[in-house]
Amino acid sequence: MNLVLMGLPGAGKGTQAEKIVETYGIPHISTGDMFRAAMKEGTPLGLQAKEYIDRGDLVPDEVTIGIVRERLSKDDCQNGFLLDGFPRTVAQAEALEAMLAEIGRKLDYVIHIDVRQDVLMERLTGRRICRNCGATYHLVFHPPAQPGVCDKCGGELYQRPDDNEATVANRLEVNTKQMKPLLDFYEQKGYLRHINGEQEMEKVFSDIRELLGGLTR
């Protein structure tokens, strides 16, 4: 099964990726992991990517696509893969289509974990961290026994600057704009499937499992 997983920050993509990989035994391929592995192995493309990353620049499409091609040709991808964080643009999506066609494969599904903006805001702005021991809480999902105080060490809880409303709203807006053309592209191709990410974590995975059931029979 050849899958792409998509979702905005806070949609629970990481959790569902873990469950898919564990259940179906396919590798979870994230852009960050791919870059790190290619740089560690010292491949020509990995070294090129390192130059851009060290300068704080975006890695150009041709380098990213080359690294994805190298990764998908490895033995552990023969029975499928779960791509996460790639593609990010329609140009990358088209390159992925061409790359898979070269090796006689195609995507099965692009799974979009769909969560409304207001729910994402609540999830992302509710995080609180202990200044003393680093324990993490959430005002709604995992609140401390006493507001503002760490259960473990009694330290003060604070909100990280990048978890405040303005920063989170901006992050979601940027990601939404970037993702929309990609969702439209995969909708037209017939690969896109929306999963309601506002349900309990287990129900979200149950819906994904139901979708993927036809591929494993």
Swiss-Prot record:
Key word Nucleotide-binding present: yes
Pathway noted in the entry: Purine metabolism; AMP biosynthesis via salvage pathway; AMP from ADP: step 1/1
One GO term (biological process): AMP salvage
Reactions catalysed according to its record: AMP + ATP = 2 ADP
Binding site for Zn(2+): C130, C133, C150, C153
GO cellular component: cytoplasm
Domain-level remarks: Consists of three domains, a large central CORE domain and two small peripheral domains, NMPbind and LID, which undergo movements during catalysis. The LID domain closes over the site of phosphoryl transfer upon ATP binding. Assembling and dissambling the active center during each catalytic cycle provides an effective means to prevent ATP hydrolysis. Some bacteria have evolved a zinc-coordinating structure that stabilizes the LID domain.
Protein family per UniProt: Belongs to the adenylate kinase family.
Protein name: Adenylate kinase
Organism for this UniProt entry: Geobacillus thermodenitrificans (strain NG80-2)
Recorded name of the encoding gene: adk
